[in-house]
Amino acid sequence: MTRTKQFLTSSVATIASCAAALLMLMPLGAKAQSASASDDGEVDRTPHIHGTLRCKYEYQTSEGEGRFEVRNARVSVDGKVTPFISYKAEIDLCDEGSIKMLDAYTRLKPIQPLAFTVGQMRVPFTIDAHRSPHQQYFANRSFIAKQVGNVRDVGAAVAYNMNVGFPVVLEAGLFNGSGLTGQKDYWTKSVNFSAKAQLFFPRGFNLTLSMQKIRPDHTGVMMYDAGAYWHAQGWHVEGEYLYKHYSNNAFHDVHAFDAFISRDIRTGSKALKFVTPLVRYDYMSDHSDGSRYLDGKKSAEGSLIVNDYKRSRLTGGLTFSFAKPFISDIRLNYEKYFYRSGAIAKPSERDKIVLEVMTRF
């Protein structure tokens, strides 16, 4: 009974703190415009259908082995039912061979700068992990986006947009902590949350700060992320650092970093619009997914283990865009891995050449 009371008290306090912070900041933003139109207010209820197809060929240079893969076959439906209520549902028909429900949420905008989202979504955390597949610069994601900070969950989030001389976006939410599966019988006494602030400075500069608490198993995990980028005149320069801490010293702290630079070059051709050379460096220390293992299987009798060994990677390549970038791209990359002594490289995480065709519709 005491634990239940503590959980409820903690939950209410967290929600109240987020709400109070947003209410205090509201006067700084642009003047709110009410979206409370009448039931007969005009709104286009036509659903919008979008999708992303990513097909690629990878060749591992050391092993002399190659494979074709459909990495993503995503389809999404979104739209509005009233001037201030919208929705989105997204499914991946082939996420490395598996079918996954990704987004399923309703969004309410009672006033223009404020939005509430309830359902399953990508939590507000990091820069690179928050990118959709068609928005990625490289064929394979960074270590931050793939191993360390990639989280979708079920919960409720609030976002507030304001202008303090430059645009600022604040987001915060409470989530199950269960991930995409196991919702039906998942009950928790812990509070899992995420918060993110994006500052869009003049001349294409951005600073993003975020934090997140999850509890994949019996161990609480806190993550802190700081990233910045400059996007202007065809250039994109970005750097991001993530720090991950496990409670009760269940596993040593994890550090992850990535930095890259790209340059869109117009070709003047009617078919091939842009050629983009780009290069990336990313790094991660030994990493645990937060679950206990015994004899290679998840078990409450086990302990946290190294799921991803310490490594760094250098990636270089070219992207060929047949429309504006991130619509119809061919990505050609070479990845060079550097593992620590004694590390075991997974089959798909070795030196390789990647040729990917991405189509967004």
PLM segments and residue spans:
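Compositionally biased, intrinsically disordered low-complexity segments enriched
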Residues: 5-8, 35, 122, 200, ...
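Sec-dependent signal peptide recognition
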Residues: 5-9, 13-17
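Outer-membrane beta-barrel pore domains
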Residues: 61-63, 82, 107-109, 129-131, ...
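Active-site cleft segment of glycoside hydrolase catalytic domains centered on the general acid/base Glu
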Residues: 183-187
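Bacterial N-terminal signal peptides
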Residues: 14-27
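N-terminal periplasmic/intermembrane-space "pro-region" immediately following the signal or transit peptide
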Residues: 2-7, 25-54, 361
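Short, solvent-exposed coil/turn segments
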Residues: 31, 70, 99, 151, ...
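Outer membrane beta-barrel
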Residues: 37-179, 189-191, 197-206, 260-262, ...
